[in-house]
Amino acid sequence: MAKERIRIVVCGDKGVGKSSLIACLVKDQFIPNLQDALPAVTIPRDFSASPYSPQNTILVDTKNSDLAGLQKELKNADVIWLVYADHDSYERIALYWMMMFRSLGLNLPVILCRNKSDDGIEYCRSNLTAGGEGDCGTIVEDEEFIPILKAFKEVETCIKCSAKNKLNVNQAFYLCQRAITHPLAPLFDARIGELKPLAIQALKRIFVLSDKDQDDYLSSEEIAALQKKCFGKTMDVNELNFIYKTLVDLSASNQQYADCSLFVQNKGITKMGFLVLNKMYAENGRHETTWGILRSFHYTDSLSISDKVLYPKVDITDTSSVELSPLGYRFLVDVFLAFDKDNDGGLNEDELNVLFKCTPGLPKLWSETCFPYSTVVNNRGFITLQGWLAHWSMTTFIDYKTTTEYLVYLGFEKDAKLALHVTRARRKRRRNGIFYRAPVNDRKVFNCYILGKPNSGKSSLLESFLGRPFSETYSPTIRPKIAVNSLELKGGKQYYLILQEFGQQEPAILENQQKVMECDVLCLAYDSSDPESFSYLVNLVNRYQHLKALPMVFVALKADLDKQQQRCNVQPDDFTEQLLLEHPLHISCMWPSSLNELFIKLTDVALEPAKNTPELVPEPIQEDTTVYWQATVVAGSLLGLASIFTFTLSRLINSWRNVPN
């Protein structure tokens, strides 16, 4: 990535012209009879015409007589400008200088420069063209450079210069900068002439994201869009045709690509063609182009996406929750539709595999929750759009960092935190000495824990929530289960409800008060046909007193079976009355209407927690005094009018009596 400052250390045998190169670069002229070593020179960004220059570049001259000082400077360097000038100094490149760098444990790019090449302009990266600033390179078969390049992977580029004739001095300096701003080593293995695996992986991902219609080709329009995104400018038709022709010619002339298509007429560039094109850029010294593509997709020098992009800082209080914003939902809808190639309304396994090729794979959280069976699937087991959005809503609620990470991998181009909505902190109120949660009006995702004795019907409840048929087969829950779905309340408002069952981990979960407080509503379920079932809930509530801080809904499951008297010191209706709660809802997986009533009830309670908070005395109903006061005002007005009428009438009568006959 672009650095604010680059430190270039110039080293080599005495007399090879290190100081002359620096002086020529700075003064733009050859200066003879310089001192043994120049002081460090700071070169600002505007010195170079290159758009990739850092804010400052420091050039450090060295002298061999001060070995300790030389080694200190090398350890502080970003890049090494290694200079030789004749056969003897060339021999010491491999025998002395490269060995010294390795003994110091340096892992820095080395730009090898043959100075005093006063007879011509030559510049080599292996035996291939490496166009530098101004694209001045020529193809060079150089018996000096090639052995060094093959023997030492640290040597990134070789160039012939002349300080006396001012030849390639600026280019050599530019190559030193480019070795840091646009390093070749992460992209290309010069020894085997191939792109490195991480580069291939990154470029394949970029191809998939740029292939908007998912037809496995980059069309002219898609290439133009990629060009605009990466470089901020459009691509000329002639440039595009030149790329196409290059790929076609390469397919015809190179046996390596005989069995694969690089470009198909009227369709576009294939994935292999895209990789080959970037390989050619690396071979020809134009890897700035590849880096321009990579960095527009947020890749760092290590070919990983920056953590600052994957995990943006989001300010969240302890009692806030995180949900998807409308922008996040819109993006995920677009992703679903783009990868649903057969337009059947569901993502099958192959479509999901293609979708997640752009990412590190299926999110760990999804694997742990048995995706896709933790949400809505169609009759063929393919996740639907409803299930897709529900699962992402759950993921964001539980671990929003997974959501931002995968949104970036899937091609979300804006700041990932714009895809999130942070709810207001949960507020508490107090009534008669009991704290309870205030009503919620800015949330759409709620978390419900289902607690109850094994074999009470909790798993069947989760399956019914996802619209699946009831199964008579009992399978004990060992690991936690989770289900998420959307539901619509009166008024057309849509919410997402997460149901969690903990199985054998239930005691450990309930011991963890912080984990318990993440819940919005408790669903306490028992088997109404099992006389031993309800006592489990009584013991649970009495043992874990902190559960009473949460709103509760008691549920009598298997209501289609014969109801049994519970073998407990308190019956369900009496126990709920003691807690000042409503009597248990009678639910059966065989009665769809009762299930819908339960899920709506759970969501309503999450929105209005006070209604179902244990031991919370209902707020006194205040009589509506409006009618009373209206009646009082009317009566007062009538009384006033009557008084005025009586007074006026009496005055009239008196005046009549006083009139003489």
From Swiss-Prot:
Residues where Ca(2+) 2 binds: D340, D342, D344, E351
GO CC, alphabetical: ERMES complex; mitochondrial outer membrane
Bilayer-crossing regions: 627-647
Keywords noted in UniProt: Calcium, GTP-binding, Hydrolase, Membrane, Metal-binding, Mitochondrion, Mitochondrion outer membrane, Nucleotide-binding, Repeat, Transmembrane, Transmembrane helix
GO biological process: heme transport; mitochondrion inheritance; mitochondrion organization; mitochondrion-endoplasmic reticulum membrane tethering; phospholipid homeostasis; regulation of mitochondrion organization
SUPFAM superfamilies per UniProt: EF-hand (SSF47473), P-loop containing nucleoside triphosphate hydrolases (SSF52540)
Entry's Gene Ontology molecular function annotations: calcium ion binding; GTP binding; GTPase activity
Positions that bind GTP 2: 452-459, 488-492, 557-560
Membrane topology designation: Single-pass type IV membrane protein
Mitochondrial intermembrane domain ranges by topology: 648-661
Top-level taxon in the UniProt lineage: Eukaryota
EC number in record: 3.6.5.-
Cytoplasmic side: 1-626
All copies of domain Miro, residue ranges: 3-182, 443-608
Domain EF-hand positions: 198-233, 327-362
Keyword Manganese: no
Binding-site residues for GTP 1, renumbered to this chain: 12-19, 61-63, 115-118
Localization: Mitochondrion outer membrane
Binding site for Ca(2+) 1: D211, D213, D215, Y217, E222
Role, per record: Mitochondrial GTPase involved in mitochondrial trafficking. Probably involved in control of anterograde transport of mitochondria and their subcellular distribution.
PANTHER family for this protein: EF-HAND CALCIUM-BINDING DOMAIN-CONTAINING PROTEIN 7
Family, as annotated: Belongs to the mitochondrial Rho GTPase family.
Name of the protein: Mitochondrial Rho GTPase 1
Organism encoding this protein: Eremothecium gossypii (strain ATCC 10895 / CBS 109.51 / FGSC 9923 / NRRL Y-1056)
Gene this chain is encoded by: GEM1
